[in-house]
Amino acid sequence: MKVSILLPYKEDYSKENAGAVSIFVSGIDKYSRYRRSTKVYGNTNYKNFLSKNYVNIPFKKIFLQSSSKIYVKNFIDLEKQRKSKIIEIHNRPSYLNYFTNLQKRKFVIYFHNDPLTMSGSVTIKERLFI
């Protein structure tokens, strides 16, 4: 079963500068029964990744455009080719709004921080959507 893990775009998945979410994902992935069919997607400028199954999403910031929107759009382009069964989203419930055109996939959201303070899960309406 193919699993895609999407890190927050500011999260660094490198040995030199790994964030808490990256360390969590790397640690869990080591013991997963699906580790051979799992890909971790993110954006970093470093080359020494925490695991071999990491895919660096090409990402260039465009003036007056949402960095999150560009990042998720680039991930969706990659995901349309890969066709994972499960997509894990870490710490960014607002990303779910962009995945409406990806069908036949299951989504898992990990909250590493307080969900009531995160964009995309503050209001009752947003939480019902999730």
Residue ranges and their predicted role:
Residues G27, K73-K80, P115, S119-I130:
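Membrane-proximal helix-turn-helix segments that form the acceptor-binding/catalytic region
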Residues M1-S4:
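Extreme N-terminal starter segment of soluble prokaryotic enzymes
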Residues L6-K15, I23-S67:
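N-terminal strand-loop element at the rim of the active site
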Residues K61-I86, L96, L128:
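An amphipathic, basic-hydrophobic alpha-helix
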Residues Y46-L50, L96-N97, T117-S119:
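Short, charged/polar "capping" segments at the starts of alpha-helices
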Residues R33-Y34, L78-K83, N101-Q103, I130:
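Flexible, charged surface loops at secondary-structure boundaries
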Residues I89-S94, F111:
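Short His-centered aromatic/hydrophobic patch
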